[in-house]
Amino acid sequence: DERVFPPPPRTKPELIESLPFPTRGIPGIPDLMHHKYVVRDGESVWTGSTNWTTDSWTLQENVIVLTHAPAVAAEYARNFEELWTHGDVDRSGHEEPRTVDVEGRQARAWFTPGHGEELSHRIARAIGRARERIRIASPVITAGPVLGTLAQVAAEARVDLRGVVDRTQME
């Protein structure tokens, strides 16, 4: 069973350049610019896994989160300013995450690559602390701390553990 996948759609630079507002191209080498968010009026954030392509909206499963929390919006705006100012993905996500209050709950917005390794370990620790059930949905899982913790949790058989991954990434 040979599968043929079309190349991903490409943005036409002249289309982006014709937009009536300033844009900044971020080089995707050596690090991929993978951010996907809108900060609206300093009050709301729309974010998730969705690439802003027709295929992403119509053919792919994605998750989208909308939060109306000015403190969270401020953190995303801070990350945007990092990207806008430096124009370099590798220099993004190094700001220390701030704990913010969202309706009486503490929250932090984490950005990568700056905090990527730390986040991998934090996610692994959170998985390891599960008491009842874990559900994992990721196109691919290659992070050592996460894989190791999943293997340990599975071996202990103490929680209901299930995961979905992109099968094309497994072949």
How should each PLM-predicted stretch be described?
Residues 1-171:
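Charged, low-complexity intrinsically disordered terminal segments
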